From Swiss-Prot:
GO terms for biological process: translation. It comes from the Bacteria. This is Large ribosomal subunit protein bL28. Signal peptide: none annotated.
Length: 62
């Protein structure tokens, strides 16, 4: 799946953008995903990982 964190499963969220007149327009908030090289099952792979997962140490870059 594209644009989904392989560690935490974080992905884009949807909601409404509200104008001053409170008109609603659909929009998306993307997760802060970084494409990094990590070792998974002994192989080096390039995967999308959220910045929060990187900062918390759930995954380590290669």
């Amino acid at each position: 799946m594209a644009r989904v964190c392989t560690i935490t499963g974080r992905k884009a969220r949807s909601g409404n953008s509200r104008s001053h007149a409170m008109n609603a327009t659909k929009r998306k908030w993307g997760a802060n995903l970084q494409k990094v090289r990590v070792r998974i099952d002994g192989k080096v792979q390039r995967v999308y990982v959220s910045a929060r997962a990187l900062k918390s140490g759930k995954i380590e870059r290669v």
